[in-house]
């Protein structure tokens, strides 16, 4: 195994007694790539990592929460299909100086990763990413880790990993200009520029002016109010 691949494994370390598997299929009428996914309740081996990076199916998914209820990474899963504007998202992240890595996901949306050098409590990672997702305007997106603690037989939910092929990955990171980082060397360099020592280094920029009309409202509604409601979204926002 190459040094780059070993580093990739270190970056995405998670639960090692279970892992996810995903088998790709064709796109449905909404443009989403359909797939069959399941969890294997057995020890994760190096061969599974190798198979994933070699482009062999099924591809690999990792459960970020470990048996001690900590993790070294988490992600916001923005589930969108063809036409998602990754560059706009990256610009928004950079404007607020958030140390996040954006990857194109299987569906064409984005996996927005937050990496830390030392393990943190899964509950703290989940809370931080929930706050970030709401601030970015994606408060309804799934957050990984989805669990804050595991029982001895529990497995949690997995997230599909990027770099599912050495030459033609469909899931890969994007740099600060939105360009594809289509190999592990480029990804690792980008990771090193974003990883933080602890979650205290990840600060959400406060709004310049408090809107007292929305004081006490959920973060997702405060974000929507500050940016304006899209045409036709009034009823949906009222429902929220």
Where are the predicted features?
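A common structural junction motif
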Residues: 96-98, 130-139
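Modules that initiate DNA replication and primer synthesis
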Residues: 27, 71, 78-81, 87, ...
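Short secondary-structure junctions
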Residues: 17-21, 98-102, 140-142, 172
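Conserved NTP-binding/hydrolysis core of motor NTPases
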Residues: 100-101, 109-111, 132-133
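Long, low-complexity interaction regions most often at the N-terminus
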Residues: 3, 10, 124, 137-138, ...
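DNA replication initiation on ssDNA origins
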Residues: 1-73, 80-89, 155-158, 163-166, ...
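Short beta-strand
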Residues: 62-65, 100-107, 142-145, 151
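Short amphipathic beta-strand starts and helix->beta connectors
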Residues: 53-62, 92-100, 224-228
């Amino acid at each position: 195994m190459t040094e780059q691949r070993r580093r990739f494994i270190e970056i995405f370390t998670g639960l090692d007694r279970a892992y996810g598997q995903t088998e790709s299929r064709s796109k449905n009428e909404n443009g989403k790539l359909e797939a069959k996914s399941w969890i294997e309740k057995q020890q994760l081996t190096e061969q599974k990592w190798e198979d994933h990076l070699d482009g062999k199916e099924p591809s690999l998914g990792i459960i970020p929460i470990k048996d001690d209820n900590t993790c070294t990474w988490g992600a916001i899963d923005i589930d969108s299909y063809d036409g998602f504007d990754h560059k706009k998202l990256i610009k928004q992240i950079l404007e607020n100086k958030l140390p996040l890595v954006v990857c194109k996901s299987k569906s064409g949306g984005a996996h927005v990763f937050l990496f830390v050098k030392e393990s943190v409590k899964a509950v703290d990672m989940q809370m931080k990413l929930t706050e970030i997702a709401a601030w970015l305007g994606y408060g309804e997106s799934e957050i990984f880790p989805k669990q804050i603690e595991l029982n001895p037989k529990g497995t949690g939910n997995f997230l599909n990993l990027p770099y599912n092929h050495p030459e033609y990955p469909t899931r890969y990171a994007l740099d600060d200009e939105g360009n594809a980082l289509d190999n592990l060397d480029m990804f690792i360099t980008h990771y090193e520029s974003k990883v933080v020592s602890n979650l205290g280094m990840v600060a959400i920029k406060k709004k310049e002016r408090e809107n007292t009309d929305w004081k006490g409202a959920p973060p997702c509604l405060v974000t929507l109010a500050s940016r304006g409601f899209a045409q036709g979204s009034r009823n949906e926002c009222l429902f929220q």
